[in-house]
Amino acid sequence: MKHNRIFRRRSYRLSALRASLRDVTPTARQWGFPFAMRIQPKLLSTFTLVNVVDDEGYYLVGRIALLVDAVLQGRLPRRLVSHGNYIGFNFRITVQHRRKDAPEILELEAVIGPCDGRRLAAYVWLIEPPSDPPF
């Protein structure tokens, strides 16, 4: 069927992935981060730094950029995991839910690459805790 051809195109299949990781590269570069950065939109829309009024996520992006930079420079010891041309690590950040008063500690995962030097990008997303088993 002709109308199904669009689903076979590579660009159409990747559009959902592109929408799930918002490009915050200009903001990260203002904080001195050297790579392109993409952060899960749920993280930016739901959380902010503790005791900071941050409507657009500017300070949250800056804090994440500083943490990732500290891990790469060795100032924040973390175990780096190789994913082929990419390296990844987990880290924690203290944030506050936009609609709650209590601070929370979130577990985030960052993957940086490709490590061959072309168009480096850092991808950051929230690690969801496992849900309770249904039984």
Provide a role label for each language-model segment.
Residues 51-134:
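Functional cores of ribonucleases/endoribonucleases
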Residues 1, 134-135:
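Intrinsically disordered, low-complexity and often Lys/Arg-enriched segments
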Residues 1-63:
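N-terminal "domain-start" segment
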